[in-house]
């Protein structure tokens, strides 16, 4: 393969099955040390991982040590994910994610009344390893587990807790209107009042069966009295 046909690490990573939620971070952004402030304290093998992301030649000892190479690969994936979480809060990053949002790359809301509203990736924590990525519906304002299992192992910290909200703050024109229809439970054609379940639960909580009755024993005050006349006498 010629050098002109070689694929960059970033393009390769984003093209992996299960990484469809990621966009390609601009190389200029990665090379700016200001954008990486503090990440060296979070990512092991930081220097080697950054070199791998930027397609710089690895050290000879890394090439000769498969175990070390695997560790650097894992560190590079983590580092790229954390860089990605910062990048998609920038104007350029938001623009790239909007393109994916409009084509439905992040899936569609499973709620019937949201009418297949496109969703956005969201993290429930900004700390790596705490929660996997979820999908956020801006129409019903709720969070769902991604439909495809291949996205169930993507760390939510690589998208952050604030990305969808930043996108709609910068581009309010993309925020959909809230759904006008709301599901109403019915029984025999009649609407079930919202208090019906609450009253039912309250009634169940107030009903307490006597303990002895639960065990199939008569209540204490109903126990037969000991009658001396009925007890057989020993001869």
From Swiss-Prot:
Instruction: Specify whether Cell cycle is a keyword of the entry.
Output: no
**Does Phosphoprotein count among this protein's keywords?**
yes
Give me the ranges of the annotated region Disordered.
213-235
Per the record, what is one GO cellular component?
Answer: neuromuscular junction
> What GO molecular function annotation could you give as one example from this UniProt entry?
protein kinase regulator activity
Positions bearing Phosphoserine: 2
Superkingdom of source: Eukaryota
Tell me, what is an example of a GO biological process annotation in this record? eclosion rhythm
Q: How is it modified after translation?
A: Phosphorylated by alpha subunit.
Q: Which SMART domains match?
A: CK_II_beta
What are the record keywords, sorted? Phosphoprotein, Wnt signaling pathway
Family as reported in the entry's similarity comment: Belongs to the casein kinase 2 subunit beta family.
What is the annotated quaternary arrangement, including any partners? Tetramer of two alpha and two beta subunits.
Describe the function of this protein.
Participates in Wnt signaling. Plays a complex role in regulating the basal catalytic activity of the alpha subunit.
**Protein name, UniProt field:** Casein kinase II subunit beta
Q: Which organism is it from?
A: Drosophila melanogaster (Fruit fly)
GN (gene name)? CkIIbeta
């Amino acid at each position: 393969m010629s050098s002109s046909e070689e694929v960059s690490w970033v393009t390769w990573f984003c093209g992996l099955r299960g990484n469809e939620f990621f966009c390609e971070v601009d190389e200029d952004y990665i090379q700016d040390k200001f954008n990486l402030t503090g990440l060296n304290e979070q990512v092991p093998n930081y220097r080697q991982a950054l070199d791998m992301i930027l397609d710089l030649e690895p050290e000879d000892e890394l090439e000769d040590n498969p175990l070390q190479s695997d560790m650097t690969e894992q560190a590079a994936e983590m580092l790229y994910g954390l860089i990605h979480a910062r990048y998609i809060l920038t104007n350029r990053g938001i623009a790239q994610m909007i393109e994916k949002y409009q084509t439905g790359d992040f899936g569609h809301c499973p709620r019937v009344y949201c009418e297949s509203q496109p969703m956005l990736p969201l993290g429930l924590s900004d700390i790596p390893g705490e929660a996997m990525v979820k999908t956020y519906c801006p129409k019903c304002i709720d969070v769902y587990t991604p439909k495809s299992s291949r996205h169930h192992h993507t760390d939510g910290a690589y998208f952050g807790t604030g990305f969808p909200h930043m996108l709609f703050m910068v581009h309010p024109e993309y925020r959909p209107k809230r759904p006008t229809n709301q599901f109403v439970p019915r029984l025999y054609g009649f609407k079930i009042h919202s208090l019906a379940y609450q009253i039912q639960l309250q009634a169940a909580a107030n009903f307490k069966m006597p303990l002895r009755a639960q065990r199939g024993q008569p209540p204490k005050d109903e126990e037969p009295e000991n009658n001396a006349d009925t007890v057989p006498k020993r001869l």
